[in-house]
Amino acid sequence: MTVIGVSGKKRSGKDTFFQMLEQHSDVPVYRLAFADTLKNEIYERILEPDGLSRSMLDNDETKEQFRLLLQWWGTEYRRRLFRDDYWLTKLSEQLEQYKDQDVIVVITDVRFPNEFKFIKSIGGFMVRVSRPGLPNANDAHPSEVALDDEKGFDTFIDNNGTLDQFDSIVRSYVGALNSGARVARMVSVG
């Protein structure tokens, strides 16, 4: 199992990175996210009792309405009130199903130092995707800024061009990954 953690601001291209990597990889690629369990908890405790759909948390038209709730539940409630590694433990359990398989698992929402360290500790790669000029780029919530000064990423991708340019970068990344490269710094030209 190869694990790739992806970090970046909201709407920077983390899920698009996963989708493109999945297209270009020769081995099966699976997506996990710390927020999957978070969204399931929000759904079960808040949305479902009111007859609302789980898809509201992922739908581009409705998910922003829930962002503050997700941030509060995930950070202020679970991480601070329970324990810092609450989501890490949940994701670690999910990773077990891929152990000893020739697959790539992409974790599309690495946001905190302990998540970053966990991925590195199991031999995973860390990718930082940035996208200059995003609206709401000044969101100061800890889940948006905790890794801003982290220098230990294996790859930095500046997603400042077209989708085709981003796709080309991801194809190059897959090539570097297949060749066994540990560090592959790439910059998009837009």
Label every model-predicted segment.
Residues F34-D102:
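ATP-dependent small-molecule kinase phosphotransfer cores
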Residues Q23-R31:
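Post-Walker A helix-loop "phosphate-sensing" segment adjacent to the P-loop in P-loop NTPases
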Residues K10, K90, N114-I122, R128-G190:
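Small-molecule kinase domains that catalyze NTP-dependent phosphoryl transfer to phosphate-bearing small molecules
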Residues M1-I4:
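Extreme N-terminal starter segment of soluble prokaryotic enzymes
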Residues D109-F112:
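Short, well-ordered beta-to-alpha junction loops that form the rim of enzyme active sites
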Residues V6, I107:
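Hydrophobic anchor at the beta1->P-loop junction of P-loop NTPases
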Residues F17:
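Hydrophobic positions on the alpha1 helix immediately C-terminal to the Walker A/P-loop
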Residues K14:
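Conserved lysine of the Walker
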